[in-house]
């Protein structure tokens, strides 16, 4: 080895070049005034002595890293990394390696110090070739790079020019944090190493594929980078690694990843760090120089105050010792922290506290004595009780004697009796200490006000440290006062409460709410409590919210469990679909005085002051609108559909059925009366469009022949009708037709039981619709057994000039099948239907006129009609079948009319088709099976009926009804 000359030569010797493993003569020069520090090598020592040109000169100022390389098959290798590439030197032994490496590092540090730059060496440096794959070409990082590893990041340094031969720019240097690397791996046969980056990396998400010199380098890169990613501790400096001869960092403990489990599931750390001379500062060991401590990522703890027995890796302080230590449960040294110094609170698990969601080990650097609380690093205060301190029993301080301990700051965990006066002095002293810490200086909120708010209930605070609430909020003090019997008013106590879900705060059964809360305040009103809003009706207010004036809050205050508060549901919307009580129904029925001898489905309503009993052919919307305008006594139950079973003794609900079932005056049906039905629906020329019953206009003009012959033999021939042809185009005669069409069914009061039985079975066709509807409608069958009448007390009806009730029963049978209007081949079926129709149907002439005396009533003449098919077959005049209603799409279901054999019926209100003003139809009395629905409500078109959903069959329906 040559000696150091005057030109600054420091070391020289025959070493091997890593790439070729050939011996070369290397000379290391220090920095001089004329030249900088450099490393030169020659082919032989002879050429060096001959002052020949060196084969290569490496300036140390261009080397960004000099370290030992451990990934080759040679043990003692030093690598100098620069922008021109890496240069490796293979030495013969460890001593030579340390001598050359130390000298190189000293010269490098001197250069960095002279330039005023900080030298940050890399732990590992590999030379790789990044392939054009993944995101490399997108971000411009392709070609030969140095892959430099540190404890925090992975840096790629460009080798060679910063432009590709194609003229594309290359990234000179880029640093990727290890925390943004999702995974890494290698392929041994192909010498490929890849890294998958996450979205938070500087390059974005994607893969980087790089090629190494050999498979050993790829394996070493994988192990080193993965160990650095998961290592718990930082790697040491290169110099320490070199002198300790540590091949890699794989033996280091793995770094703990972030965990969401609780402390009970975490492994126990048995390392107890103590220092009896000075208090140690515990910090997160992210610095590479903190060799004694391990770095941990933040752990997601349960969001509540943890007790000392379940918390690990936290800092505790002893009041008599100036040191800190990191410990866990079960290994706490008894000499430094006593068992009595555990101010833990038992908090309910349902409550959460955001300030203890994660535990930090960063503490202050003071060396004074500390209290026995587990310090919370996010606030300046000490341990904080839960915000709902009323969920557990309030505690007071009790005196616990302990040697060398002060009793002022001790917090016992014993329950206390609020009425005990022994500890009043201790509470007063502690309250003064607590008031001393209340120093608030906010511009919007005076400190006196906040101090007063915290002093509302000193006993409930339990003399514990005050919670750091946000500005303007207060502590809840209600439950403790309620236990003492002092229930604060809602408006005067705007304390902070917890929000509850809908219905969760109701402490009494729902039936009690209906009986007490909803009905007790309004015993004489029949409107139920819907949505707690006032239903305006002539200025009156319904429901229990009528007397409320306080505005509901978003989080209502809780009340006592044994007290029914009228404001319990003040902030919630509750819809009550229950019916009124039976007592209310009985009162309502008694006030309206419904006759007992009438089988009612609809309640009686008082007669309003209307000008005339005009029948309106309106829609369902007009019916309900008219009922609202004409009668202001409608309850809030009008829209309900009563579906309860009806028996003999059943009284329907008075709140769920529409009112406006008016009694008919006998004088309204006189022939001299003005017309009662106004033609407003359809023109005259549309007479043939009558719902699904296509009745031609010529049929209405035919002279009745057979009905006149049967008229004299009718048992109701007291007041015969004048049978005249009806001219539908004449206005005056149209009024006569309409007046005849308005007569629903007069209730005849006679002494003969036969007459009563006959008039009980009269059915009239009042539902012919000329509104132009060509759509098919469901054909219903009407049983006249449901037409009820007043069997006695005729004097009462004559006195009040009223007619009785009439109830329709519409029997909807599944056998009623409607076919198309213009279906072919229906002539034969129509003949059969007409034959069946005329055998049991009695008709009434067009113009039914009668004179109503002061003491007599109008009686209908029921005429027996022979089958129309017979008249056609024998060649009789077609006028003999003048009033037979031709029905196209009608099947005839059988229905039993026996009241005793009927099953239990379910009733509902039904809006039936109505008659228009141009209806020229006579009141055709037909059998129950063939009759369409008939209007039952005289004044405003309210047509209601009972619906029988029974599917039973009986063929004796019409015969039982019309057996005269």
From Swiss-Prot:
Domain PH intervals: 8-109
Pfam families named among the record's database cross-references: IRS
GO molecular function terms noted in the UniProt entry: insulin receptor binding; insulin-like growth factor receptor binding; phosphatidylinositol 3-kinase binding
Compositionally biased residues, Basic and acidic residues: 698-712
Motif (YXXM motif 1): 410-413
GO biological process: cellular response to starvation; determination of adult lifespan; germ-line stem-cell niche homeostasis; glucose homeostasis; growth of a germarium-derived egg chamber; insulin receptor signaling pathway; insulin-like growth factor receptor signaling pathway; lipid homeostasis
Protein name: Insulin receptor substrate 1
Species in which this protein is naturally found: Drosophila sechellia
Taxonomy of the source species: Eukaryota, Metazoa, Ecdysozoa, Arthropoda, Hexapoda
Gene from which this protein is expressed: chico
């Amino acid at each position: 080895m040559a000696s150091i000359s005057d030109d600054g030569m420091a070391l020289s010797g025959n070493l091997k070049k890593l790439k070729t493993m050939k011996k070369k003569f290397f000379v290391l020069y220090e920095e001089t005034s004329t030249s900088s520090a450099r490393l030169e090598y020659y082919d032989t020592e002879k050429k060096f002595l001959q002052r020949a040109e060196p084969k290569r000169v490496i300036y140390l100022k261009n080397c960004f890293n000099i370290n030992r390389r451990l990934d080759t098959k040679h043990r003692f290798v030093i690598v100098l990394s620069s922008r021109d590439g890496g240069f490796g030197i293979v030495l013969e032994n460890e001593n030579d390696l340390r001598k050359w490496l130390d000298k190189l590092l000293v010269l490098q540090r001197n250069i960095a110090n002279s330039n005023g730059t900080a030298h940050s060496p890399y732990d590992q440096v590999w030379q790789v070739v990044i392939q054009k794959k993944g995101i490399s070409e997108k971000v411009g990082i392709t070609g030969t790079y140095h892959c430099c590893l540190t404890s925090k990041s992975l840096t790629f340094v460009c080798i060679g020019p910063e432009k590709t031969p194609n003229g594309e720019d290359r990234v000179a240097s880029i640093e990727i944090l290890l925390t943004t690397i999702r995974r890494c791996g290698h392929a041994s046969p192909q010498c490929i190493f890849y890294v998958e980056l996450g979205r938070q990396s500087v390059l974005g998400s994607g893969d980087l594929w790089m090629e190494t010199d050999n498979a050993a380098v790829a394996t070493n890169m994988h192990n080193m980078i993965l160990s650095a990613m998961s290592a718990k501790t930082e790697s040491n400096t290169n110099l320490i690694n070199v002198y300790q001869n540590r091949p890699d960092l794989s033996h280091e403990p793995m770094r703990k990843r972030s965990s969401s489990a609780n402390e009970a599931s975490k492994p126990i750390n048995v390392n107890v760090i103590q220092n009896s001379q000075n208090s140690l500062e515990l910090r997160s060991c992210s610095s590479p120089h903190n060799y004694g401590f391990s770095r941990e990522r933040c752990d997601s703890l349960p969001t509540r105050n943890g007790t000392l027995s379940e918390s690990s890796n936290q800092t505790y302080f002893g009041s008599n010792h100036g040191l800190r230590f990191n410990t866990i449960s079960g290994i706490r040294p008894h000499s430094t922290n006593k068992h009595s110094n555990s101010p833990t609170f038992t908090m309910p698990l349902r409550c959460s506290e955001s300030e203890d969601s994660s535990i930090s080990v960063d503490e202050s650097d003071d060396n004074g004595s500390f209290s026995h609380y587990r310090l919370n690093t996010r606030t300046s205060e000490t341990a904080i009780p839960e915000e709902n301190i009323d969920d557990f029993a309030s505690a007071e301080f009790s005196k616990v004697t302990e040697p060398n301990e002060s009793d002022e700051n001790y917090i016992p965990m014993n329950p206390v009796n609020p009425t005990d006066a022994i500890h009043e002095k201790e509470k007063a002293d502690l309250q003064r200490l607590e008031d001393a810490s209340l120093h608030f200086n906010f511009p919007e909120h005076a400190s006196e006000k906040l101090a007063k708010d915290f002093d509302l209930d000193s006993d409930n605070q339990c003399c514990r440290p005050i919670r750091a609430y946000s500005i303007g909020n207060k502590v809840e003090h209600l439950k403790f006062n309620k236990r003492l019997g002092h229930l604060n008013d809602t408006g005067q106590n705007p304390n902070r409460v917890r929000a509850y879900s809908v219905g969760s705060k109701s402490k009494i059964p729902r039936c009690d709410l209906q009986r007490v809360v909803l009905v007790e305040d309004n015993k004489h009103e029949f409107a139920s409590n819907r949505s707690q809003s006032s239903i305006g009706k002539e200025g009156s207010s319904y429901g229990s919210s009528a007397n409320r004036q306080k505005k509901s809050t978003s989080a209502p205050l809780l009340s006592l469990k044994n007290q029914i508060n009228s404001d319990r549901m003040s902030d919630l919307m509750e819809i009550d679909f229950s019916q009124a009580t039976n007592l209310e129904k009985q009162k309502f029925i008694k006030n309206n005085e419904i006759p007992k001898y009438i089988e009612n489905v609809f309640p009686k309503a008082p007669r309003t002051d209307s000008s005339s009993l005009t029948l309106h052919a309106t829609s369902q919307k007009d019916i309900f609108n008219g009922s609202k305008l004409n009668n202001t006594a409608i309850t809030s139950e009008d829209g309900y559909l009563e579906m309860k079973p009806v028996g003999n003794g059943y009284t329907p609900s008075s709140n769920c059925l529409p009112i406006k079932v008016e009694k008919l005056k006998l004088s309204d049906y006189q022939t001299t009366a003005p017309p009662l039905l106004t033609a407003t629906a359809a023109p005259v020329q549309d007479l043939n469009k009558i719902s699904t019953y296509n009745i031609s206009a010529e049929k209405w003009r035919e002279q009745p022949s057979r009905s006149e012959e049967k008229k004299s033999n009718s048992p109701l021939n007291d007041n015969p009708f004048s049978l005249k042809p009806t001219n539908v185009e004449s206005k005056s005669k149209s009024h006569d037709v309409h007046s005849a069409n308005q007569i629903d069914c007069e209730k005849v009061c006679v002494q003969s039981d036969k007459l009563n039985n006959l008039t009980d079975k009269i059915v009239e066709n009042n539902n012919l619709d000329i509104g132009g509807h060509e759509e098919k409608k469901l054909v219903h069958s009407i049983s006249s057994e449901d037409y009820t009448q007043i069997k006695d007390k005729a004097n009462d009806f004559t006195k009040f000039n009223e007619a009785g009730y009439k109830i329709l029963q519409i029997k909807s049978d599944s056998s009623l099948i409607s076919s198309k209007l213009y279906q072919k081949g229906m002539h034969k079926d129509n003949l059969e239907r007409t034959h069946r129709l005329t055998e049991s149907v009695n008709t009434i002439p067009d113009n039914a006129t009668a004179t109503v005396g002061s003491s007599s009533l109008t009686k209908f003449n029921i005429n027996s009609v022979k089958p129309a098919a017979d008249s056609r077959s024998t060649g009789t005049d077609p006028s003999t079948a003048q009033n037979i209603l031709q029905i196209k799409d009608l099947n005839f279901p059988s229905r039993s009319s026996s009241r005793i054999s009927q099953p239990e019926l379910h009733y509902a209100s039904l809006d039936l088709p109505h008659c228009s003003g141009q209806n020229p139809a006579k009141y055709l009395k037909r059998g129950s099976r063939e009759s369409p629905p008939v209007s039952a409500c005289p004044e405003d078109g309210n047509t209601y009926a009972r619906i029988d959903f029974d599917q039973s069959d009986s063929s004796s329906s019409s015969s039982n009804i019309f057996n005269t």
